[in-house]
């Protein structure tokens, strides 16, 4: 009897592996595959919990629920379609496998579907032709505003213009020589007024003394 049970389990396991189809649970069970209940997930239930039962609260270090599990909300209500989003990798919708057996639990790659495949879109946004415009190397640079020929264009050369050729500093104003003008040549100090000889005049020689 025991050998028969072992063989039956082996045959069942081989069939599941070959067909990649999970074992259909009992009609009163809820089932979710490959859920990571990290530390902080308040409730993580094993597959033996039935609908309406209360889940066991798990605390402490992270718990890897790699087998078929059910994540419950705080009040333990596991009925579909409630969402379990308590610190798990992805929000999880409870599946009533008795009513809707639509998930292939052996195929987790359905969560890795490329966005392009999901959209059925062939635009390939990652390699779009937007880059061909190449705004960074556009011909704006050929105008070369920085080296425009404003300076050598007119050669006005304001700094060396002929304004300075008038030579205001050395103009001929100084040649009049006001300091050495001929005013001094009149020689007022040595004028001939003194030569009139008033002191030596002949007033004393009029001959008044000759009356005696």
UniProtKB/Swiss-Prot annotation:
It comes from Arthroderma benhamiae (strain ATCC MYA-4681 / CBS 112371) (Trichophyton mentagrophytes). Residues 117-180 have a biased composition (Basic and acidic residues). Keywords: Repeat, Secreted, Signal. One of its GO terms (cellular component) is extracellular region. It is found in: Secreted. Residues 120-210 are annotated as: 15 X 5 AA tandem repeats of K-D-Y-G-H. Residues 1-18 form the signal peptide. It comes from the Eukaryota. This is Uncharacterized secreted protein ARB_06108. Residues 108-180 are annotated as: Disordered. Coiled coil: none annotated.
